[in-house]
A protein has these predicted regions:
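The feature marks the mature, well-folded catalytic cores of soluble enzymes
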Residues: 1-160
Length: 161
C-alpha cells in the first residue's frame, strides 16, 4: 500500500478548538460546556462528554447556566451568543476557527456598510448559522443552483459574497 497523504488529522482551526477544550479541562475544576459540538467528530465529542463536558445547543439552555465556562465551537456562533455570555457573566473560551472569525468580521462590517450578504452553503450548517448571526439585516443563503434565483432581485445593489 502506498500512502500519498503528506499529513492527516484535523486542520489547524479544529485542532486549536479541540486543544482549547482539553486545556480548559486541565485548568478548570468548574462546569464546562460547549455551545454545539466542538467539532464534527463523534469520538472527540464522546470523549469530552465522558470527561464531564456538556454540549448545549440552544439559547434557552445557555440562559439556564448560572456559572461555569462555555467554549464556543470551532464553527463559531452568532453574535447573540456572545452577548448572552457577557450578560450572564459566564467565562467564555472562543475556539472559533480564525478563518471563520475573519468571515464574521467581514459580514459584520460589510452589512453595516449597507451591503447585502450572500452566503454559499447549507442554511442549517452551524458555520453558516454562525455567519448569518453576524449580519446586520438579512443574509441570503445559496445552497445549490436552484437558489441562485434569489440573487436576481439584488442585481442593482451592493453585495458581499
Amino acid at each position: 500500500m502506498e500512502i500519498r497523504a503528506k499529513s492527516a488529522g484535523f486542520c489547524f482551526g479544529v485542532q486549536r478548538a479541540v486543544d482549547s477544550v482539553y486545556k480548559e479541562l486541565e485548568e478548570n475544576s468548574g462546569e464546562i460546556y460547549t455551545f454545539g459540538p466542538i467539532i464534527h467528530n463523534e469520538q472527540v465529542v464522546e470523549d469530552l462528554n465522558k470527561r464531564g463536558i456538556e454540549v448545549i445547543d440552544t439559547v434557552e439552555q445557555l440562559k439556564e447556566i448560572k456559572e461555569g465556562t462555555v467554549v464556543i465551537r470551532s464553527h463559531g456562533v452568532a453574535k447573540e451568543i456572545y452577548d448572552i455570555l457577557e450578560q450572564q457573566k459566564l467565562k467564555m473560551v472562543d475556539a472559533t476557527c480564525p478563518f471563520v472569525k475573519k468571515i464574521h468580521n467581514i459580514v459584520l462590517d460589510e452589512s453595516n456598510n449597507g451591503k447585502t450578504i450572500i452566503i454559499i452553503g447549507n442554511d442549517n450548517h452551524p458555520e453558516v448559522e454562525g455567519i448569518k448571526g453576524w449580519v446586520v439585516g438579512e443574509a441570503i443563503v445559496i445552497k445549490d443552483e436552484e437558489d441562485i434565483e434569489k440573487i436576481d432581485s439584488f442585481r442593482n445593489e451592493s453585495i458581499c459574497i
